[in-house]
Regions:
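A short acidic, Gly/Pro-enriched loop at the edge of an enzyme's catalytic core
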Residues: 123-131, 136
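A short glycine-rich, Lys/Arg-flanked "PGG" loop and its adjoining helix->strand segment in the class I
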Residues: 149-163
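S-adenosyl-L-methionine
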Residues: 100-126
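SAM/dcSAM-binding transferase cores
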Residues: 1-57, 195-295
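Class I SAM-dependent methyltransferase "Motif I" SAM/SAH-binding loop
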Residues: 66-70
Length: 295
């Protein structure tokens, strides 16, 4: 391990906005506590984020799962001071950048959590979370249950999302976007917005209309507000900028979990959509981040 990474790990211990739980805080060792979601126990922060981490700021809480270096989390927090944001990732060296920025700029509405996303339900109480962002998550083409919009993950999210809570997916992956659409259809989930080319132009009644203009007049805007539409276009991660510079289209969808499950696995032609995704992996194109990292 390089000296630079060790230095970041050491500095991470000093950031009040970064929670790095030990394994014993979320795993029941008496139940044979290996790293398995079957052996989870509640973390002391569960149900108390606004009180303990955000010093009594009683604001809606939004998660970014697989936040990487945290630039999306911190950017949203700067734009929305009346919302508390928590970026979640397993990579401490990546979280260091976001936590350091939040600390140095004094952002009061940002926190970070270092944990596996499979264990996320150990940290949040029913109704504690208002929205979830999934930004450029690994599409996990070979493992359906590892996809962050799979029925298995929807069941986890349901346990802490407030009624009508929104899940946002922003991705360069056509595979993951089409899979998520199939999941929504199979489970009759309410879709607020969906586009396969976020920065493109669509033809409606013979007129060219940008997706941004379309979203301004959509249900998404009425539910989330026009400021949320602006943020969707104006806040970009490093990877998003890379993908755009190489000509890749950005997909986006927002939906709500409207019922308590069980959630149905969709009919989905994974072979076809893997083939459609193949150009992303040609030499010279931007590689995707490590599985589940989001950055």
């Amino acid at each position: 391990m390089g000296h630079g990474k060790l230095k970041k790990f050491s500095e991470n211990e000093t950031f009040a906005c970064l929670l790095q739980p030990a394994s014993g805080e979320v795993l029941d060792r008496q139940a044979g506590g290996f790293w398995s979601p079957l052996n989870l126990k509640d973390h002391p922060m569960k149900g108390h984020w606004n009180e303990k981490m955000f010093h009594g700021r009683k604001c809606p809480i939004v998660l970014e799962l697989g936040c990487g270096k945290g630039e999306y989390t911190t950017s949203l927090a700067e734009r929305n001071p009346d919302v508390n944001y928590i970026g979640v990732d397993i990579k401490g060296a990546r979280l260091w950048k976001g936590a350091k920025y939040a600390t140095e700029t004094g952002l009061p509405n940002v926190a970070f959590l270092r944990t596996r996303i499979e264990f996320i339900e150990a940290f949040f109480a029913p109704g504690e979370i208002s929205e979830i962002w999934l930004t450029f998550s690994d599409p996990q083409m070979k493992s359906e249950n590892s996809r962050l919009t799979s029925p298995m993950f929807l069941e986890r999210y349901r346990r802490f999302l407030k009624p009508g809570g929104i899940i946002h997916l922003k991705t360069d992956s056509t595979f993951l976007y089409e899979y998520t659409k199939a999941v929504c259809k199979a489970n009759s989930l309410h879709v607020l917005a969906s586009t396969s080319d976020l920065y493109g132009v669509s033809a409606e009644n013979g007129d060219a209309t940008s997706e941004r203009e379309s979203l301004y007049s959509s249900e998404f805007s009425s539910v989330c507000g026009k400021a949320a539409v602006d943020a969707l276009f104006e806040v970009q991660t490093f990877y998003e900028q890379n993908f755009l510079s190489q000509g890749f289209k950005i997909n986006y969808t927002a939906f709500t979990i409207d019922h308590e499950g069980p959630y149905t696995y969709p009919e989905f032609d994974a072979v076809y959509w893997r083939a459609a995704e193949a150009p992303r992996f040609l030499p010279g194109h931007c590689a995707h981040p490590a599985p589940g990292s989001g950055e």
